[in-house]
Amino acid sequence: MNWYERPVRMMRWEYMQNVSKMKDMDLEQLAKMKKEDWHINCEWFVGAPGVAPGLGFQTTFKAEGFERYPGFENFDSLREYLPYAHKYGIKLLVYLNMHWYSYEFAKKHPDWEQLISSAEPYGKIHPLYGNGTTFCVNSPWRNWAFRLIKETMKTGVDGIFLDGPVVFSDCCYCQYCEEKFKKTYGENLPEKEDWQNFLWKDFIEFRRDSLAEFLRDAQKAMKEINSEGVIFLNAGGWQPSGWRVARDIEKMQDYQDFNGAEEFFHPKAEKSILATSMMAKYLTAGMKPAVVFNHYAMGSWHYIPLMPLEIKLALAQIIANRANPWICVFDPLAKNIGEKEPVAEVLGFAEENEEYYLKTSSLAKVAVHFSRQTSTYYLSQYTSLYKDLGTGKEEGLVLDQGTGKLVVDWERRKSINESLLHHSYIGCYLSLIRSHTLFDIILDKNLTSEKLKEYEVLVLPNSACLSENQRKAIKEFVRKGGKLFASFETGFYDEKGNLLEDKEWKEFLGIEEIEDLFPPMVGENYMTATEEFAGFPKSQLIERPIQTLKVRAKKSTRTPLFYLKPLPKIYMSLQGVSASPALLISKYGKGKVVYSPSLLEAFYGEYRIESTSQLITQIVKMLSLEEIIKMDAPSAVEIEVYEQKDSSRYIIHLINATGDMQRPIKEIIPVRNIKISLKLKQTRKIYHLNNKETIPFVHKKGRIEFVISELKLYEVIIVEK
């Protein structure tokens, strides 16, 4: 097993413009401190700084043909520090800034810059970090970058992290991109964003391919010097807007050794407490080891460490979801809140118990699809989706219902679709985590007959853009006994976002006919249960999602929920039940399909209405066979369970985010007497990993049952079979 396939605990110690101060430090003590106090085993060391005014062209080490960073003229940081890092078991990766360069340096290479569609340099119109520009992966700059990579590897380091390059929005229209696109597609670059233009979609793919090819050639250059070296860049997370900067882990992972993405804390951002967990689970869906990047900082106040419980919670969520943590510490680190202790507590635990994080396999039988195809190419056919609806808030006797005007701008329409998908993923994720449902995230490439054999239930949260082969694999999965839960426009478009006329697919979902979209409106529209279903009694009113299709179900389809007739305004009397079903349940072969004409997941993701989450989770539970694990605990307790087959044991991770209702979190409220039931006929021993205390258990009807007396923030329970 390669070192990077084992649990890795990464750190970057950031000195900003004062990086030269390290030449006066005791380098051995520096390495020892990071290993023994912070418990890392991998360090990012700055080789080409990412500091103002864009000094990525300078190096902190001897590199033939490259300018030295001031203060390093007679000091080779990498060659000096590397022996001490290795002495203390720290793998050394070099940080190379590859996206931010000063205007002065760019003037020496005017044909390297990324150009926007107006033929102006991107950095001129959008100065990077207020001052600086960026270069194109198809320009001769790539050869300059590959030389820097080779010079870096000659120092003997273990690998490289590339901070960039980034293919920025509306880029690139330089001569090299023009020539390459013309050679590849036989046409000139499209002039503007136009999702009805096939060339625009080709341009989107061209940008991603260009970045992937740069990484491929960067990896090749690195391995010419050290065949065992590792290389990776920030390949982007789950967010649907990733196409705007050509990020796609499925494209990049063939040429890198980690799939990494940022999940920084910002005090004003309205992020879920499970944001880091979500990023970790998404990244582990790839084929490569995952790493989640966290600043150990109070948002943009970089020299003040993040509140202790926030950083501990983030690190626990990362390792519990089988990803690797990375923290950036900014020097000098203020001591007014806490220094190394919160980080050392979690990373020290992971270091001490590394064997329990090795070679684990998921026990999840539910798969949730996060579709890069959809996030990139989805543009709904329904124009009423693009009306300004306002927020639905009523304050001071004024109701915000928007202007009702139709958005016609392509860029704005695309943003609306991205927002819907963004909230769909969040809504689906939160619903399942908060209901203690075990699930995996799967990517587009996983929608194959072979991969789907691992699961009982497949959830497609508006996976609108699916290829013919993907649709066939899904139908085969259900025909052989699998269960499907799909919503809204799932499968209505091909993998490039082109509208399909696939009547068989709609019949597969239980649809006889789609009439139109209900008038979108925030508030005062409802669904009702026409039978007892999913915990809702008959005639129960349920909030209707804003985006809802009006469909007719095919014969023999069960329809337990119906929409009420739409109301054009609030404070109006209900008009009775419509003829349009709100949920379609049908059989297909040996399996079952549940289809929601509404964007249920997006509705919960944006509005957090509990009845919607209840509907989502109860449908998934209804489709599942007997649950592998059941837990009686507050919804803010996350559970992840894995099996170590070689050691014949289950690993149960419990993360408690029950806090004081604001972020940054100041207090975690302990949860007591958590009842857990695990589907297992027999077991030898159950114990807490932190103190090895045994936990009493009982056998009952093919399951074992036990109680966790108290959960503070993070606990690992071992079940030996």
Regions found by a protein language model. Give the residues of each.
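Active-site-adjacent "subsite" loops/lids of carbohydrate-active enzymes
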Residues: S20-K21, V94, M98-T155, C172, ...
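Catalytic domains of carbohydrate-active enzymes, especially glycoside hydrolases
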Residues: M25-G54, T155, D254, F258, ...
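Carbohydrate-binding surfaces of carbohydrate-active enzymes
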Residues: W200-K201, E205-W243, M252-K721
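Short, acidic/polar
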Residues: V19-E36, S139-T152, S241-M252, T276, ...
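Aromatic- and glycine-enriched glycan-recognition loops and surfaces
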Residues: Q17-W38, K62-I90, N143-W144, S210-F214, ...
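Aromatic- and acidic-residue-enriched segments that line the glycan-binding/catalytic groove
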Residues: L55-G71, M98-L128, D163-D194, W243-E250, ...
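Glycine-rich, aromatic-flanked loop segments that form ligand/cofactor-binding clefts
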Residues: M10, W38-A48, D76-P127, G159-G164, ...
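Boundary/entry segment of secreted carbohydrate-active catalytic domains
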Residues: M1-D26
